[in-house]
Structures are given as structure tokens and as C-alpha cells.
């Protein structure tokens, strides 16, 4: 072909036009070789483009999962690892019921996975399961949040999205599921084509309506901007489940030091002001309000040993002497206000669950939020969850009330607390003193 093209160009005396078109200079004797080279390069380029297109088509070929074992492996192994392997933040929609998933899966199923980047998930909740009288759905959801505390979830009532059966990771992957009569995945179609994935994302997003939001992940700034925490303490009936230290009923000797940490170490005048305001607010609350403190036995022992508390958003380590003063102040204030009650939860009796309790719960029966102490030592995950649903708040309140009667929960009022302290004070003081030598 190169020879025929060369002969035709020379016979028509259009060599100059050829040189202009291909931006080259060529003598008649070299024309055939030049045309051959151009044809060869163009052929190689077109083959490369065709190969790339073919590879893309292969990459984007959907997967159809029909075998129970394949479905289990995909959702429990492949998909979590796939999400972790991505290099940037993830935006996920899931219309499937998280309560059913949490109840059917081991609570520590993903405990070996560590997220390296932010993941924000909007997910559906079957409120029939969540509000069931046996509390199985409620407990499963709490353990699920704890086990996946590096992921930020927004939980929605899934009443209007139950037929969608869709999971979509924006720009990445979409999974369309067919469910059996027990709402378990029977068939799953996995789509990788980014264009199709994002079309599915756009079609699915409207199902997550603001009016259906039950609880959502919240960052520090958002939590303070609208005075949420200040307003929270204006009520008079509190339930606190504390999973790290005991930041309440602090002695006066600690307040200025915590304020100074906020101001000098955090360089945060706003947080220093928040701490100072809470000091005044809490002094009033502790005088007469009803307060039920639920404290994990494991976190209480850890506090005696290391003195770590997180006051508002300030990490503070109580000195051995401050811890002793703290105990004395707790005893004194609980005697002044008989509405202060303590419940020690022996989390070691919660088989396979004791390592799954990380989020503290702060509840005044009108407003409720969860706090993630671990977030103050990592770069991913939510600081707080704000619960918006009044029905969910009442369900959690009722569950905490019932927790008082559990075999693994010990009740202490002012008298029994003093009796316990009189019996074990020397041991507690020795433990506190020994902790100073571990530094």
C-alpha cells in the first residue's frame, strides 16, 4: 500500500501537499518508506486504543452472585476489603436494613479492618426491628456502631426504600440485590461501570429524606454551633453511660487545669470558654437534679490506673492526688443530692461484647447523643452521633432503665458507695499510687 500511495502522489505531483499535511519534508526517493512508517505508527496507535477499550469493557463487566457462599464471601470479605483499598473518601448509600445485617453478623466481623480515610454512609433501618420489645435490634445496632466506629453513619427509617435493595458507593461500585422472604440477599448484581454506578446513585439518593433521619454522625464544630451541648444540660433527668473515665463530679482543683489545657495546649479559647461554662452549669445540676451514672467496670479500673478523662473535647489526665480528691468529691456530692445514683456494669459478663462498647451515651430523655472517645486519638470516624427520633430516644431511655435490674449491673447509692469505699479505700489508694510509677 505504501508503494501505491507513493506512486499516486508523485504521478499527481502533490508531494508538497503531502509534506504540509504531515508536517514533514521528504524527497521522492524516500516517500515510500515515509508512508510505510506513518501507516505502521497509525496502525499501532489504533490497536492500542482498541485494546484499552476492550480492557475497560472487561473491567466493567458486572458480576452476578447467586450462590450463598459467594454472596457471603462478597459481603463479608471482598466488599469491605475493596472499600478499604480505595485511596480517598467514600460516599455510600445503602437501602438495606442495618438491624437485620447487624443481628445476622458477628458483632466483631470487621474488627480486624482499619479504615484509613473517611467513609460516610447513609443507611436504612427497619424501625419494626429497632423498636421491638425484646430490644434485640436496638442492642445489635449499638454494637454495630461500636464495631464500626471509624465509619460515619446517618441512619434513616427505611419504610419508603425497602423495595430498592441497593448499595452504591459513589464513583466506585453498585450492588443491586434480590431478597428472600427473610429479607436476606438471595441474588446480587455487582456493577463497576462508573457511569452506571453514578446514575444509580442519583436515582437512589432521594430515598434518603431528611424527615426520615433517625440519627446522624456529627462533628465537633456542628455540635457546638447551635448550642446543642449547652441546651442539653438545661433538663433535669439524666442518664449517662460512660465508657472512658468519669468526667463528672470533678473537684474544684481540676477545673482551672482543664481550662489551661484547652487554652495553652489546644490553643482553643472557645473550648476553654465551653469548659468554664460547663463548670457553672454542672454545679447547679449536681445540687438537685436526677442523675443515673452507668459506668463500665473495665473503664472504671482503667481510670483508677491512668486518670484519663475527656472533658467536653479536652483530653486530660488526672494526677494520682486529683483522682483521690475526685473520689472524695463524688462521695460528698452524692450525699448532698440523693437523686445521684451509680450503676457499675460488669462488661466482662457480656460474652464477646465487652470489647465492643466504646460509645458513651448522654441522655436527658428529650435529647440524646453518643460520644466516641476513640476518635480523639485517631483521624477517622465521627466524634458524636446525634439522635433525632423521639421514639428512639424513649426506647434507649427505657432500655437503660431496665439495665438497672440486669444481673451484671450493681447499684450504688450514697450509703452503699460510702460503705464500699470504707472497705476498699486502702486498696484503691494503693492502685492509684502504683499507677504513678508506670509513667
Where are these regions (language model features)?
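Hydrophobic protein-protein interaction segments
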Residues: 61-411
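Basic, Lys/Arg-rich alpha-helical nucleic-acid-recognition elements, primarily the DNA-binding modules
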Residues: 1-20
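Surface-exposed polar/charged interaction patches
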Residues: 7, 41, 333-336, 427-430, ...
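Extended, compositionally biased accessory segments flanking or bridging domains
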Residues: 25-91
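Charge-biased C-terminal accessory regions appended to nucleic-acid-, cytoskeletal NTPase
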Residues: 390, 395-439
Amino acid at each position: 500500500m505504501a508503494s501505491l500511495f507513493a506512486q499516486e502522489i508523485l504521478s499527481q505531483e502533490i508531494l508538497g501537499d503531502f509534506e504540509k499535511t504531515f508536517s514533514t519534508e521528504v524527497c521522492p526517493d524516500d516517500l515510500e518508506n515515509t508512508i510505510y512508517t506513518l501507516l505502521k505508527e497509525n496502525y499501532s496507535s489504533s490497536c492500542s486504543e482498541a485494546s484499552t477499550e476492550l480492557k475497560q469493557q472487561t473491567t466493567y463487566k458486572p458480576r452476578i452472585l447467586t450462590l450463598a457462599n459467594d454472596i457471603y464471601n462478597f459481603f463479608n470479605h471482598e466488599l469491605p476489603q475493596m472499600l478499604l483499598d480505595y485511596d480517598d473518601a467514600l460516599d455510600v448509600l445503602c437501602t438495606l436494613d442495618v438491624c437485620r445485617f447487624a443481628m445476622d453478623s458477628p458483632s466483631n466481623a470487621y474488627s480486624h479492618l482499619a479504615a484509613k480515610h473517611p467513609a460516610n454512609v447513609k443507611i436504612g433501618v427497619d424501625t419494626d426491628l429497632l423498636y421491638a420489645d425484646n430490644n434485640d435490634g436496638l442492642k445489635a445496632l449499638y454494637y454495630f456502631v461500636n464495631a464500626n466506629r471509624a465509619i460515619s453513619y446517618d441512619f434513616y427509617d427505611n419504610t419508603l426504600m425497602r423495595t430498592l435493595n441497593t448499595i452504591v458507593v459513589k464513583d466506585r461500585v453498585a450492588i443491586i440485590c434480590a431478597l428472600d422472604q427473610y429479607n436476606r440477599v438471595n441474588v446480587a448484581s455487582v456493577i463497576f461501570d462508573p457511569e452506571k454506578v453514578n446514575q444509580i446513585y442519583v436515582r437512589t439518593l432521594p430515598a434518603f429524606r431528611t424527615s426520615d433521619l433517625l440519627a446522624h454522625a456529627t462533628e465537633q464544630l456542628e455540635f457546638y454551633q447551635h448550642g446543642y451541648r449547652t441546651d442539653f444540660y438545661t433538663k433535669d433527668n439524666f442518664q449517662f453511660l460512660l465508657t472512658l473515665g468519669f468526667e463528672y463530679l470533678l473537684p474544684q482543683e481540676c477545673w482551672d487545669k482543664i481550662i489551661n489545657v484547652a487554652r495553652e495546649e489546644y490553643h482553643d479559647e472557645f473550648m476553654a470558654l465551653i469548659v468554664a461554662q460547663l463548670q457553672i452549669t454542672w454545679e447547679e445540676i449536681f445540687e438537685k437534679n436526677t442523675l443515673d451514672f452507668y459506668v463500665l467496670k473495665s473503664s472504671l479500673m482503667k481510670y483508677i490506673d491512668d486518670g484519663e478523662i475527656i472533658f467536653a473535647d479536652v483530653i486530660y489526665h488526672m494526677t494520682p492526688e486529683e483522682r483521690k480528691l475526685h473520689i472524695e468529691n463524688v462521695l460528698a456530692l452524692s450525699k448532698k443530692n440523693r437523686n445521684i445514683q451509680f450503676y457499675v456494669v460488669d462488661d466482662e459478663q457480656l460474652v464477646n461484647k465487652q470489647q465492643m462498647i466504646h460509645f458513651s451515651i448522654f441522655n436527658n430523655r428529650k435529647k440524646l447523643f453518643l460520644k466516641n472517645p476513640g476518635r480523639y486519638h485517631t483521624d477517622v470516624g465521627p466524634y458524636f452521633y446525634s439522635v433525632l427520633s423521639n421514639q428512639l430516644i424513649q426506647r434507649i431511655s427505657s432500655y437503660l432503665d431496665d439495665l438497672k435490674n440486669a444481673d451484671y449491673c450493681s447499684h450504688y447509692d450514697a450509703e452503699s458507695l460510702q460503705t464500699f469505699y470504707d472497705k476498699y479505700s486502702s486498696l484503691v489508694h494503693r492502685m492509684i499510687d502504683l499507677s504513678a510509677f508506670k509513667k
